Amino acid sequence: MMELLWTPEAVRDREDIYDYIEEDNPLAALAIDDLIAERTAVLQDFPRMGRGGRVPDTFELVVHSSYMVVYDIVETQVRILNIVHTARQWPPLEE
């Protein structure tokens, strides 16, 4: 079993998603957060479950029709890098 590590950026993304949804529907915010937790936990046993990412050396896992988790694998760790809304440009355009 791989270790699951959340980067500070991914934690911030998750909190932002929760806060945004909670404004209109607290129960939906809990449901989405639980879904993100459940789907990412599966990566501990199946780390290559996601498709190859658009950023080199990453993977992408759609956890909900609106959200995708970007992660990489480093030795015995699955590192959650970002959670991205599927309607957003990913990777972001460089300025």
Features from the language model and the residues they span:
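Basic, Lys/Arg-enriched alpha-helical interface segments
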Residues: 1-58, 74, 93-95
